[in-house]
Amino acid sequence: MAQENLLIELGTEELPPKSLRQLAESFASNVEAELNKAELSFDSVRWLASPRRLALVIANLSDSQADKIVEKRGPAVNVAFDAEGQATKAAQGWARSNGITVEQAERLITDKGEWLLFKSEVKGLSVAELIPEIAANALAKLPISKPMRWGSSSTQFIRPVHTVTMLFGSRLIQGELLGVASDRIIRGHRFLGEAELIIDHADQYETLLDDSGKVIVDYERRKAIIRDQVEALAAHENGVADIDESLLEEVTSLVEWPVTLVGSFEDKFLDVPSEALIYTMKDNQKYFPVLDKDGKLLPRFIFVSNIVSRDPAQVISGNEKVIRPRLADAEFFFETDKKKTLASRLESLSSVLFQQKLGTLKEKSERIANVAEDIALQIKADTKHAQRAGLLSKTDLMTDMVMEFPDVQGIMGMHYALHDGEEQEVAIALNEQYLPRFAGDKLPTSLVACAVSLADKLDTLVGIFGIGQAPKGAADPFALRRAAIGLLRIITNKNLDLDLVELVEIAKLQYGHKLTNDNVVQDVVDFLFARFRATYQANGYSVELIQSVLVRRPTKPVDFEKRLQAVAKFQTLPEAAPIAAANKRISNILAKVKGEINAQVDPSLLQEPAEIKLSEILGSLESTLRPLFDNLDYESALFELASLNEPVDEFFDNVMVMAEDPAIKANRLAILNRLRNLFLQIADVSVL
């Protein structure tokens, strides 16, 4: 069976840059699934993409499906023929439907009987017959939220499609995709390359676009070129480029032939907090800021052009003219905002709703202040600073700078607070209240900042759950999942001795009678436990391990973490599996008991040496374990409990638990209950 590389390319108008990678990856994934479904053999599916095209190269694709022998079983022989050996209507009808006579049918003999059988050879379809439908199906499944129509066609896609190329080796596959017929024409760069290129063979694709089209169609190669060029230019300016991965991805999706250039701006703008300048460079202009070796902003920026200009200085000047008004705006906002203190802006928060049923941002700030003060007291942070930071936490939202550049909220609060003469710890908390912003982000550095960040997240969680608007499915408009995970990360990583139920109760208290959900405390705590499960599972812990701890519902995250780590290490012991099995057996026995089980073991009722031995060991262990439990030293406790493996085995081998004498039976159940409760003080190892 012959093999060739297959090229599929859609030439489009400019695709949304923030969606380009996802579209290309989804296209490749969908085509791969369709090829497997069609049972076509291939080595790999590689995606390529630029602003004006989506493309795939399928390596070593077979030219057709394999031929198949299809077997169709008919009626059983004893049903197919009557007593005289004549074919019945059932047999005749089956044969007719398969285009044969009964006499032409073969026989299938198994240990269960004998049946009529028809075998036919089905020729595999060719790539030319299959690929148009495969590609169409793959395109139909792309994640496109807002498709558009163009021209007079009813066809919809994310952007208008102008060319389609499906090339199997040198052979053009005829067909249409999105209303456009397959052709050998591909388009070069809009300004630098040839408008139309004729491609003769799939293997020419990248080279042809590189040489004649001035398009680097390999996304990852283009991205690497941009990174290298930006870093080299920054080094030439005695600096380091501030390269965000998300910005690099977006810029890669905006250009087909990257040319990096460096521009500059006046030193006076460096008096403005660098975060505001960096924000406008990155977010508004898609520029890469340049920092010195100490991380301070230099009056330079690097941008990526999509053309090779005969006069680069003109291009640089044009970009400098574009950025200068943005920087001037930031300078103006900064100077204007400093004329009013953050404290003086608190009252203006009364005009901004946090949520219709939950009141204004001023009310939210007051709640945050109260909760932050309470948390600070518990974690031995400065309560006055925590209360003050909580009260001022949202005031920078009313500044011109934050209204213009929303992403600098918090950081501008810090700068304005320092200008106002607020305590440094208060100012830092205003910046760090939003941490962590995303998975893997840094955490607040001070205890005051931790208190404010926790208070803010608790207020949002309790408020939204309290009015019955918990997240449903993927929808999470208030980012409650992120808030919950951030809350748990702060408490766990900072080793804060805080109880979730107590925290939620404190936050609930601040709302007075605003909340309508009577079960809000339980609902929020359950939501937090669910985030425990998801977070630890993502970190590689097994579902069983996490569940063993969740059964105990330890409401202190630090306690939860210590239990989880202890059980994880316990699982590595050779005694772990038999002890888990024994706990499961004990759990099943105790679950069937009707009525209460004695809390104490009566030594006078012990008869068998194995039960005497186990009871004595349990008594000794209880004394040993008590200080370990008090110190949350669950790891040492489980190592001690591992010593029960042998005496428990002896007990089950030599002792009849369900004895005929009710008193002896009850006493033996009490031994098992006592043993089970020792383990349950840490986790339910029976689920391991």
Swiss-Prot record:
GO cellular component assignments: cytosol
One GO-annotated biological process of the protein: arginyl-tRNA aminoacylation
Chief subcellular location: cytoplasm
Pfam families linked to this entry: DALR_1, tRNA_synt_2f
Keywords associated with the record: Aminoacyl-tRNA synthetase, ATP-binding, Cytoplasm, Ligase, Nucleotide-binding, Protein biosynthesis
Keyword GTP-binding: no
Annotated EC: 6.1.1.14
Top EC class of this enzyme: ligase
Subcellular location: Cytoplasm
Reactions that this protein is recorded to catalyse: tRNA(Gly) + glycine + ATP = glycyl-tRNA(Gly) + AMP + diphosphate
GO MF term (any one): ATP binding
Presence of keyword Cell membrane: no
SUBUNIT field: Tetramer of two alpha and two beta subunits.
Family from the record: Belongs to the class-II aminoacyl-tRNA synthetase family.
PANTHER family reported in the protein's UniProt record: GLYCINE--TRNA LIGASE, CHLOROPLASTIC_MITOCHONDRIAL 2 (PTHR30075:SF2), GLYCYL-TRNA SYNTHETASE (PTHR30075)
Name the record gives this protein: Glycine--tRNA ligase beta subunit
Native organism: Psychromonas ingrahamii (strain DSM 17664 / CCUG 51855 / 37)
